């Protein structure tokens, strides 16, 4: 019989033999997470209902027709182009439910909405085999799918339609008809979106409505998730007059478009949401140039702009013909000993949210229910947290970081750990220059 062998946890083996454990030197797995994630609902006339679906900027550019029903440059996708100007991933949601699908005797549109009325089905005898049929799906007159089959039962659903099973016969083109959009988008539609988006993680939430009651709904959702659930993100909303909170950014400039009529005046919220989501943790949008497609109302005097800043308004203004962000601020107005002026800066909130979110992920994936709450376990947690903050120091999001300001101690119960970071210096971008020149 072979001698004993294998791995060991305690020195309690009976058989003589060789027992060995191999392991690596413990290394902190703490890393800074990427930004660029936004969540937003859209009024669409194509796409799935009542579900959140992530779309990357690459998907948007290459596959927008399949996902949203239109090519990238189509006027119908203006809100999506605005948010994707700087966001890398958007959790999209189609507002409303009950859109009617367009149909004919050959096929039914994959999704409800008026876009289905632009679909046509053609049937032609195959030129090589007279027992086969070429069945094509066209959108705006362009072929998007062709299948060669002997009978309609052999047709496979594509990105645009599901097929019925009539007897095939030649037809130059049968349009789908009867597609209708949702009759009304209201507060319930937005509440349904908020219910669906709650479990997701993102940097910025977009509220694309001018209705004050619905804006307040988004405000309450944001404050609840930030303060009670611990999900750290900021809300971008249109003129949130009652907001006084570092987690809410209020957009006030009205928007129009040079060639697209009936653009909602609040449409700028999409661009701001994407820009705030895509802004790096060590950067600011102060003086950032607007590079979307909208025409913004920037007819403000210096006195009006100063008053707007004091009121916590996120404003754009004219700088030598360019449209730029006046200052990257949120709606926080009421200051206190524990929440001072620095919390009015969105750059500060990005740093705070980065620490909160990354520490939460670190704890949940490495420590929760796994690492003993003893001195060694807390020392490991301390090491990971200090590594996170040191990473922020390395990219100049914070400065003069001393690991000694971080403590991890036994909490009030055996399973609790109390971590305190006392005296962290957050860096903000330069915004004002005061200069004295003395001439002799």
Predicted segments — roles?
Residues 407-440:
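C-terminal edge-of-domain segments
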Residues 2-372, 376, 381, 388-396, ...:
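A glycine- and small-residue-enriched flexible loop/hinge signal that marks low-structured segments
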Residues 386-389, 423:
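Generic hydrophobic alpha-helical scaffold/packing signal
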């Amino acid at each position: 019989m072979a001698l004993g062998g294998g791995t060991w946890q305690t020195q309690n083996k009976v058989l003589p033999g060789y027992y060995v454990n191999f392991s690596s030197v413990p290394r902190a797995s703490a890393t800074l997470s990427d930004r660029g994630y936004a969540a937003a609902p859209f009024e669409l006339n194509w796409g799935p209902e009542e579900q959140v679906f992530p779309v990357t900027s690459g998907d948007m550019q290459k596959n927008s027709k399949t996902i949203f029903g239109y090519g990238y440059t189509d006027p119908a996708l203006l809100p999506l182009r605005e948010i994707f100007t700087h966001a890398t991933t958007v959790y999209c949601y189609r507002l409303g439910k009950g859109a009617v699908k367009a149909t004919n005797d050959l096929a039914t549109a994959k999704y409800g909405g008026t876009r289905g009325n632009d679909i046509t089905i053609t049937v032609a005898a195959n030129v090589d085999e007279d027992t086969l049929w070429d069945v094509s799906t066209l959108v705006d007159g362009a072929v998007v799918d062709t299948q060669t089959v002997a009978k309609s039962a052999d047709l496979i659903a594509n990105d645009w339609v599901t097929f019925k099973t009539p007897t095939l016969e030649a037809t130059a083109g049968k349009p789908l008809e009867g597609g209708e959009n949702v009759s009304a988008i209201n507060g319930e539609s937005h509440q349904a979106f908020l219910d669906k988006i709650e479990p997701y993680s993102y940097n910025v939430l977009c509220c694309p409505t001018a209705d004050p009651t619905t804006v307040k709904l988004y405000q309450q959702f944001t404050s609840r998730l930030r303060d009670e659930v611990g999900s750290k993100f900021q809300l971008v909303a249109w003129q949130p007059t009652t907001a006084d909170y570092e987690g809410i950014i209020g957009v006030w400039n009205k928007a129009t478009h040079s060639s697209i009529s009936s653009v909602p005046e609040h449409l700028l919220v999409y661009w701001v949401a994407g820009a705030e989501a895509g802004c790096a943790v060590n950067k600011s949008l102060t003086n950032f140039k607007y590079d979307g497609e909208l025409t913004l109302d920037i007819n403000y005097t210096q006195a009006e702009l100063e008053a707007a800043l004091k009121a916590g308004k996120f404003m754009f203004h004219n700088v030598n013909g360019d449209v730029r962000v006046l200052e990257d601020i949120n709606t926080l107005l009421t200051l206190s000993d524990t929440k001072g002026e620095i919390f009015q800066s969105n750059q500060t909130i990005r740093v705070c949210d980065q620490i909160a979110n990354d520490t939460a992920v670190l704890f949940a994936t490495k420590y929760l229910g796994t690492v003993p709450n003893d001195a060694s376990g807390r020392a490991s947690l301390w090491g990971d947290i200090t590594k996170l903050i040191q990473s922020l120091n390395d990219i100049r999001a914070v400065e003069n970081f001393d690991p000694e300001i971080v403590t991890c101690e036994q909490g009030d119960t055996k399973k609790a750990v109390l971590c305190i970071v006392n005296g962290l210096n957050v860096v903000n971008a330069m915004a004002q220059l005061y200069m004295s020149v003395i001439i002799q």
